[in-house]
């Protein structure tokens, strides 16, 4: 028999239904010569420092750097049952082959391989690599399985990423926490991302507004302006000279310009667009598109390609015809698609661009969640715009003279709407007001206009804008390679698959907060970046590391070279920072400590309230209760101060008004806090005996 291991139960069930495994067992499905089981995300992870040596339970400078000679892994808390099921299935004598069917990417490869290794499995391994959950795509994937060894370099890249995160997180966090006597959390990718947000915020704070004035003349719905004046009286004089006067277009620099259609979406460009249009966070967009991928409505989401493979031309034409009839904003739209614009196998690595599948044709789109529906409309519209004609217009840069004063006017004249027609229809459908563009005007050199109205406007120079998720994702993608072109080798902070989680972690850790659409550093975030060295917070260096991980996946760089470089950096930091000046330590003095709300059940130290959690004050202890706890939220409750105090004092709380996730009805139960002694706190439901 063949054992198929997916990344999550829902994917496993979808695969099982296609390959004929339909008999449900405990933790797997059986049938037609297959056993189909699943992980639940990561089941196995790297051991904590204290699992290498008990002395590492205490954070001490003299123990640094901590660099394992032989890396150890362990089964993660809360996943032991499913790991046990997989281990038993792998060792079953009936199983002669194991098929890795986790997500077709770096992290999916790691999830499976760590389970395979931890279980001590030596059986032949195959890899299922698909970009769609459609039935035919699954059948084709199982018909063309590759040997697992073909993905060894991808596994090494994933393993290096995990080890690098461990080395930087463990050593840098301990080093600077000990030096400053504060619990400072440092992350390999998280910290440089925070540094960009802090740097932008600092530039805004340091910006000094400067006032300036412009004189205007208005004629025939046209508005021409002067250059900037520092003094209002100078602008007033020009406006007075031109009131009721005639003007002449002295120069008209006309250029025909062509704007090519946008490319198809990769994950980052989709997240950016959804943030611009709907205000969705990167994580919300990823969750929506992942859910629709599992519903077979769109292709694999965690891609960095904006093209399709050359052989997808015919199927793309069929897809477009379906979308024209299915999408409500496409009603009455007529255009000749040119699919050759989106085909380029050389620019597709692991997965092609995100597009809808033909399953959309029979789907009831109206029954989708609102967010999913909007994202599906975006993805579908991008297929249409990407294959549409270019937008062509005449650009007019006019120099206008009025009573010996010079004014300037920019205008345009559209010659071909092209893909803009589809974009306008989509925005009208969503009720989005189009951005202000240059006016469409009939104007040419030598023509006289007037008499003119004139006035003066007051303006201020503008500071840089705070990052939104849209602009931060762009900055993360370009980090270390600001002059990014289509053919440039990509570096960047994180990957399309991880950037959303990085942003969310910064917010959950209390380093960044959302202010409407903006991402703004907190006081803790500002202070952390102030004291860390450039090597740790440099986006460019971290981007170089990300590129090195890509090289490992491509088998052009070795894992040892990469990890040796990280280790040397940690050794250098520990040697350089043996002490901290009193001046720098004072940056942490006087910081308000959160209110003590109880005692830690793990170590007995005080538990204090923070911005996003209630955590143990002993930095050697990781006990934390999160204010946005997902379990309590799923039951209609919050982890507020009163709730946290009750859990710490009694260990459980009895509720009469919990809310069922399935039915929405209220029910009665006791929520018991279960502390495993390490890792995350868990909660159990105890129902009253009837």
Please tell me what each predicted stretch does.
Residues 9-16, 33-36, 40, 76-87, ...:
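Amphipathic alpha-helical transducer elements in NTP-driven molecular machines
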Residues 295-301:
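Secretory-pathway/luminal and periplasmic proteins that interact with or process carbohydrate-rich
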Residues 232-265, 271:
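Metal- or metallocofactor-binding catalytic centers and their adjacent structured scaffolds
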């Amino acid at each position: 028999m063949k054992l198929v291991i997916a990344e999550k139960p829902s994917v496993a069930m979808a695969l099982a239904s296609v390959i004929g495994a339909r008999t449900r067992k405990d933790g797997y499905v059986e049938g037609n010569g297959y056993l189909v089981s699943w992980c639940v995300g990561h089941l196995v992870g790297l051991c904590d420092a204290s699992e290498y040596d008990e002395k590492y339970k205490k954070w001490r400078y003299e123990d640094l750097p901590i660099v394992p000679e032989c890396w150890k892994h362990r089964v993660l808390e809360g996943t032991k049952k499913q790991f046990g099921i997989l281990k038993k299935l792998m060792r079953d004598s009936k199983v002669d082959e194991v098929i890795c069917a986790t997500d077709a990417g770096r992290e999916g490869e790691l999830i499976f391989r760590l389970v395979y290794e931890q279980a001590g499995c030596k059986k032949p391994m195959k890899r299922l690599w698909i970009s769609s959950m459609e039935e035919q795509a699954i059948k084709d994937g199982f018909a063309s399985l590759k040997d697992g060894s073909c993905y060894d370099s991808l596994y090494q890249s994933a393993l290096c990423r995990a080890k690098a995160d461990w080395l930087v997180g463990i050593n840098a966090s301990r080093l600077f926490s000990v030096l400053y006597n504060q619990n400072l959390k440092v992350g390999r990718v998280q910290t440089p991302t925070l540094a960009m947000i802090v740097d932008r915020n600092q530039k805004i704070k340091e910006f000094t507004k400067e006032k300036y004035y412009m004189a205007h003349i208005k004629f025939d719905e046209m508005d021409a302006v002067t250059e900037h004046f520092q003094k209002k009286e100078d602008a007033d004089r020009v406006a007075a000279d031109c009131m009721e006067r005639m003007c002449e277009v002295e120069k008209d620099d006309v250029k025909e310009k062509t704007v090519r259609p946008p490319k198809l979406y990769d994950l980052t460009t989709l997240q950016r667009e959804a943030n611009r249009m709907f205000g969705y966070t990167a994580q919300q967009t990823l969750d929506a598109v992942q859910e629709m991928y599992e519903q077979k409505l769109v292709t694999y989401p965690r891609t960095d390609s904006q093209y399709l493979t050359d052989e997808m031309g015919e199927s793309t034409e069929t897809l477009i015809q379906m979308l024209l009839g299915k999408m409500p904003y496409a009603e009455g739209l007529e255009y000749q698609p040119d699919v050759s614009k989106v085909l380029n196998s050389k620019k597709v690595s692991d997965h092609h661009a995100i597009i809808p599948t033909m399953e959309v044709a029979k789907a009831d789109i109206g029954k989708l969640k609102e967010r999913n529906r909007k994202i599906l409309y975006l993805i579908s519209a991008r297929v249409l715009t990407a294959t549409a004609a270019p937008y062509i217009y005449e650009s007019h840069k006019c120099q206008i003279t009025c009573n010996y004063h010079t004014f300037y006017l920019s205008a345009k004249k559209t010659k071909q709407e092209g893909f803009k027609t589809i974009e306008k229809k989509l925005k009208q459908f969503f009720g989005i007001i189009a951005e202000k563009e240059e006016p469409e005007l009939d104007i040419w050199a030598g023509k006289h206009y007037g008499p003119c109205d004139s006035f003066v406007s007051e303006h201020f120079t503008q500071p840089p804008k705070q990052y939104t998720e849209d602009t931060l994702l762009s900055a993360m993608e370009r980090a270390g390679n600001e002059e990014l072109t289509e053919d440039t080798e990509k570096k960047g902070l994180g990957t399309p698959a991880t950037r959303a989680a990085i942003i969310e972690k910064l917010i959950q850790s209390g380093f960044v907060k959302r202010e409407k659409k903006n991402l703004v550093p907190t006081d803790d975030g500002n202070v952390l970046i102030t004291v860390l060295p450039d090597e740790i917070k440099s986006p460019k260096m971290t981007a170089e590391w990300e590129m090195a991980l890509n090289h490992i996946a491509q088998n052009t760089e070795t894992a040892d070279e990469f990890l040796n470089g990280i280790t040397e950096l940690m050794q250098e930091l520990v040697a350089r920072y043996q002490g901290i000046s009193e001046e720098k330590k004072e940056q942490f003095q006087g910081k308000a400590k959160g209110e003590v709300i109880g005692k830690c059940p793990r170590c007995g130290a005080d538990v204090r309230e923070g911005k996003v959690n209630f955590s143990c004050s002993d930095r050697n202890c990781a006990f934390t209760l999160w204010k946005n706890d997902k379990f309590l939220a799923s039951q209609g409750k919050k982890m507020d101060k009163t709730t946290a105090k009750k859990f710490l004092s009694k260990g459980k709380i009895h509720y009469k008004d919990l809310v069922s996730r399935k039915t929405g009805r209220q029910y009665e139960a006791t929520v018991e806090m279960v502390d495993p002694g390490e890792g995350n706190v868990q909660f159990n439901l105890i129902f009253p005996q009837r």
